[in-house]
Amino acid sequence: MEEYQGYFELDGYQQHDFLYPLIFREYIYALAHDHGLNRSVLLDNVGYDNKSSLLIIKRLISRMYQQNHLIISANDSNQNKFFGYNKNLYSQIISEGFAVIVEIPFSLRSVSSLETTETEIVKSYNLRSLHSLFPFLEDKFPHLNYVSDVLIPYPIHLEILVQTLRYWVKDPSSLHLLRLFLHEYYNYNWNSLITPNKFIKSNPRLFLLLYNSHVCEYESIFLFLRNQSSHLRLTSYGIFFEQIHFYEKIKYPVENDFTVAILWFFKDPFMHYVRYQGKSILASKDTPLLMNKWKYYLVNLWQCHSYVWSQPGRIYINQLSKHSLYFLGYFSSMRPNLSVVRSQMLENSFIMDNAMKKLDTLVPIIPLIVSLAKVKFCNALGHPISKSTWADSSDFDIIDRFVRICRNISHYYSGSSRKKSLYRIKYILRLSCVKTLARKHKSTVRTFLKRFGSKLLEEFFTEEEQIRSLIFPRASYTLNKFYRGRIWYFDIFYINDLVNHE
């Protein structure tokens, strides 16, 4: 972001907290479609001149201000859907460009909070991966006893999102334009605003930014109290959260003695907090009484500070040893790992049973088969079938599509402690690919496998399997058992549609 700061001309705008003029900048909308911010060629080949695009943007914004949002019929909602990705394209482009502009204050603060050392940058990049959470769970969860899976509530009114964002973006004009976007979308379906699977196709960049700012608002307070009350300070969260006007938002001043009492009341050095998608996990080594205190504290924080409604009865507290947690596409549970140690002292020998808890991560085979059945790779029982819609493609395209899906699933579930379910999913995809090719060539599966079986199956090998076969062509049982262990990758930043069963 630092290299684009001069290009954005942010010094003048940031000095007065005025971002609204950036809406009329041509390169903003080019960057909105270039999500990586890396390809400078796109900035030069936009396709239309600055004057025409500036007039279009001015007209659309004026039309938005002139609309009467109180009188909208059902027919108008179908014909003039504001955020439809196939209808009213220019309005969607404005909303995408607006999302890029609102992200600027967040990006500048995150860049300034990072240290200039290369190790810190690499560490922060690795923490973006979804798999970075699992080594943390492997390290911490065996020492904990209770876990609570919490569904993060969303605000009941759109103005709460605007007020939350007001502490980051102090530009009234931009906030007024944001209100127009939100109220226009609210007339169609407010529930789909927070549900990722429903609004992800409309404008995910804007609404994910709003949702993350809403969650970050209450987490900044929650983690502030957590750090103050713990003997083990969580310094790693400093680059992700900021305490935004914490004491200014409290209507009445709080006495220092009372604050210390509250912090002592929640003191627990073994409390851990993890957030993923729209849920969060609270895990502790202490008794269920302390977990209940944290549960009601969270509910009061949501209701009194963030003005969102949450029911304490929906937050369940479970024992890790008896409860399986569905977490980012894995079924995670604590499995006792028994080991027998024989020790001998002079003439006496002793046999001791040593039981250690270990995090067990399993592939959810039934939800995965349901997902494969929906996209016609298999039937409801998990038997592979041909993909009829791909039969008209070339052989290379058919194999390439199946191989990419198979490798993505293998890559994501490489951390599974038991590979049997993963092998079954790969078998379904391989046989579905063979049946699709056999259907295209009007042949049987057996005949097709006799001709191209060995070469075809080699395409489905992952990179790890190929390297292992080259290094250890005749690996022993011990080596095969070793390489069947869990592997976590730090280059996974999103969940595949087949993996996401939420």
Curated annotation (Swiss-Prot):
Pfam families: Intron_maturas2, MatK_N. GO terms for molecular function: RNA binding. The keyword Chloroplast applies. GO terms for cellular component: chloroplast. GO terms for biological process: mRNA processing; RNA splicing; tRNA processing. Keywords: Chloroplast, mRNA processing, Plastid, RNA-binding, tRNA processing. The keyword Membrane does not apply. HAMAP family: MatK. Belongs to the intron maturase 2 family. MatK subfamily. Usually encoded in the trnK tRNA gene intron. Probably assists in splicing its own and other chloroplast group II introns. This is Maturase K. The gene is matK.
